[in-house]
Each structure stands twice: as C-alpha cells, then as structure tokens.
Amino acid sequence: MSNATVDDMDENLVGPVIRAGDLADAVIDAVIADNPGKEVHVIERGDYVRIHTDRDCRLTRASIEQALGRSFVLAAIEAEMSSFKGRMSSSDSEMRWYYKS
C-alpha cells in the first residue's frame, strides 16, 4: 500500500472513493486481499479516501465481511462511495472497477 498525492495518480489507476471511517478501513483491507500482487494506492483526503489499483480493482463481499467481522450487503458501499475512477460493474458478491481504453 502506498500513500501518494493526487499529482502522482496514474491515469490507469481505478477504484472507489469512499467516505473516511470504519467502512473505508475495511474496504482498504479487502481490496488488498482481493488484489494479490498489486500495489494498492490509498490517498487520504480528510473526509474521503481514494483506494486504487492499476487497471483492475476487485472488492468481494467475502473479503469485506472478513474485514468488518460481520455480514454486509455489498450494494451498501454505493451510499458511502462519493465517486470512483474507471468503469464499474457489480453483483451481489463482487464490485469491480476497471480501465478500458
């Protein structure tokens, strides 16, 4: 995981922008677990946190439930997500942000 500045953001980085707090912390842990071998970029900006990986970022319900220690409806992230970078697809079990030229 790295802390970078917005100026350092590569145009190929994708992922959610989440309100800071316990859920954001759990999303960071889950994104790290769901994207093995990828560098996870975390940029804290006061009230929100940018969580990005290069070209493809996965977040599974199983990983976020493990990070939170309780069951969780994945769609509830959308209420806490002020924005995202890239394209997004979602299902009951996974959210994915990806880069497509």
From Swiss-Prot:
Signal peptide from the UniProt entry: none
GO MF terms held by the record: monooxygenase activity
The organism's place on the tree of life at top rank: Bacteria
Induction record: Induced during growth on aliphatic alkenes (such as propylene, ethylene and 1-butylene), epoxides (such as propylene oxide and 1,2-epoxybutane) and chlorinated alkenes and epoxides (such as vinyl chloride, cis- and trans-1,2-dichloroethylene, 1-chloropropylene, 1,3-dichloropropylene, epichlorohydrin, and epifluorohydrin). Repressed during growth on other carbon sources.
Cellular component, GO annotation: cytoplasm
Record's keyword terms, sorted: Cytoplasm, Plasmid
Location(s), subcellular: Cytoplasm
Any Pfam family hit: MmoB_DmpM
Primary location group: cytoplasm
Stored InterPro entries: MOase_MmoB_DmpM, mOase_MmoB_DmpM_sf
Recorded family membership: Belongs to the TmoD/XamoD family.
Oligomeric form and interacting partners: Monomer. The alkene monooxygenase multicomponent enzyme system is composed of an electron transfer component and a monooxygenase component interacting with the effector protein XamoD. The electron transfer component is composed of a ferredoxin reductase (XamoF) and a ferredoxin (XamoC), and the monooxygenase component is formed by a heterohexamer (dimer of heterotrimers) of two alpha subunits (XamoA), two beta subunits (XamoE) and two gamma subunits (XamoB).
Task performed by this protein: Effector component of the alkene monooxygenase multicomponent enzyme system which catalyzes the O2- and NADH-dependent epoxidation of short chain (C2 to C6) alkenes to their corresponding epoxides. One possible role of this small protein might be to facilitate electron transfer between the reductase and ferredoxin components.
Full protein name: Alkene monooxygenase system, effector subunit
Organism phylogeny: Bacteria, Pseudomonadati, Pseudomonadota, Alphaproteobacteria, Hyphomicrobiales
Gene expressing this chain: xamoD
